[in-house]
Design a protein with these regions (language model features):
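Conserved ABC transporter NBD signature motif
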Residues: 14-24
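Helical segment within the ABC ATPase nucleotide-binding domain
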Residues: 140-154
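Conserved small/polar residues in nucleotide/adenosyl-binding loops
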Residues: 2, 6-15, 170-171
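A short, proline-enriched helix->beta-strand linker immediately N-terminal to the Walker B motif
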Residues: 119-123
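ABC ATPase NBD coupling module
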Residues: 25-42, 68
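Hydrophobic anchor residue at the start of the ABC signature
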Residues: 62, 114, 125, 138, ...
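Conserved ABC ATPase "signature" region
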Residues: 24, 76-95
Length: 172
C-alpha cells in the first residue's frame, strides 16, 4: 500500500498520511511528490523486466532521473550511470550502458534497478521484493549489495518482503 502511494497509484488510502521529512506525501502537489520520489526516495521494484523500458538503453534509463530533475547534463548523467553500474557490480559498464534490458540476466537487471534507485543519492531506499525470482546465490549477492550501498550512500532502507529466508539473512 505504501509502495503504491509512492509510485502515484490511485489505490492509495487517502484518509491516512505518509510523512517524509516533514511533508505529507498524500497531500503534496504531484510535482512535489514526483520530485521527492525522484530525488529523496529511491525504489527498487520487484520485477526489473517489467519495470525497465525495453526500448531504452540501460545508460539512458539509469541516468534518466538526473536529467528529469535537471541535476546533470546528458553527458554527466551518462558518466554517472557508468560509475554507478560499476558500483553495483556490473561487468564492463561501458558496454552495458548501450545494452537493452532483454540482453541482461535477471540478476544484472536487478543491479540496474538498484543503480536507478540510487542515482540521485536518496536518503531513503525502498526495496520491494528485490530478490523475487532470483536464484539463492543471486539473492544473497543482491542483499549484500544493498547492505554495502546503504552504508556507502548513507541511506536508510525499507525491505518489503515475504521471504523469511531473506529477512533472516539480511543486515538491512
Amino acid at each position: 500500500e505504501i509502495s503504491a502511494c509512492l509510485v502515484g497509484s490511485e489505490m492509495c488510502i487517502r484518509d491516512r498520511s505518509i510523512v517524509f521529512n516533514g511533508r505529507d506525501l498524500t497531500s503534496s502537489p504531484p510535482d512535489e511528490t514526483r520530485r521527492i520520489r525522484g530525488m529523496d526516495i529511491g525504489m527498487i521494484f520487484q520485477d526489473p523486466l517489467t519495470s525497465l523500458n525495453p526500448t531504452m538503453k540501460i545508460g539512458n534509463q539509469v541516468g534518466e532521473a538526473l536529467r528529469i530533475h535537471k541535476v546533470a547534463s546528458k553527458k554527466k548523467a551518462w558518466e554517472r550511470s557508468i560509475d554507478l553500474l560499476r558500483k553495483v557490480g556490473m561487468p564492463r559498464p561501458e558496454k552495458i550502458v548501450n545494452d537493452y534490458p532483454h540482453q541482461l540476466s535477471g540478476g544484472m537487471r536487478q543491479r540496474v534497478m538498484i543503480a536507478m534507485a540510487l542515482i540521485c543519492s536518496p536518503s531513503l531506499l525502498i526495496a520491494d521484493e528485490p530478490t523475487t525470482a532470483l536464484d539463492v546465490t543471486t539473492q544473497r549477492q543482491i542483499l549484500d549489495l544493498i547492505d554495502d550501498l546503504k552504508k556507502e550512500f548513507n541511506t536508510a532502507v525499507i525491505l518489503v518482503t515475504h521471504d523469511l529466508g531473506a529477512v533472516s539473512y539480511t543486515h538491512l
